[in-house]
């Protein structure tokens, strides 16, 4: 190894994002990455974007104060039973404040109701499952009740799509 008197050039190479990406896709990914200025803005504590008092999940509050790099390293864990119970109690407390107590207790026993936090937009299109629809079902034999027989076909025909001769939907 002989010392070389000529000055050496240092070559800096930018590692490719992913070897299987074409250069155009790599450029699009690079453009979408946040700049340091936007990272500072999003991690700013004085930012009024999120009201932490309105967030019921204490784990979410702690992740908001983390930097994006710390949030990326953190793996998602399922909530413990205690955390889940506090979230449910918080949700039910909000429901009781907005609705009358009778409606909230009836909706919790219904198996067809939507999960908490999701508005039930399809209730108008579904057949009525309370009172009137269940009275005729009581007179039917128990085998039909166990199979979950729907009300008469007259009620459902308005909600069914027309089918062609092969059974495919025309719409």
Swiss-Prot record:
Record carries keyword Transport: no
Region spans: Interaction with PPP1R15A: 143-171
Keyword Iron: no
UniProt cross-references to Pfam families, sorted A to Z: DARPP-32
Region Essential for activity, residue ranges: 9-12, 42-54
Modified residues (Phosphothreonine): 35
A cellular-component GO term for this protein: cytoplasm
Biased composition (Polar residues): 122-133
Lineage top rank: taxon: Eukaryota
GO biological process, one term: glycogen metabolic process
Region (Disordered): 17-171
Modified residues (Phosphoserine): 43, 46-47, 67
Record family assignment: Belongs to the protein phosphatase inhibitor 1 family.
Protein name as it appears in the record: Protein phosphatase 1 regulatory subunit 1A
Organism whose genome encodes this protein: Rattus norvegicus (Rat)
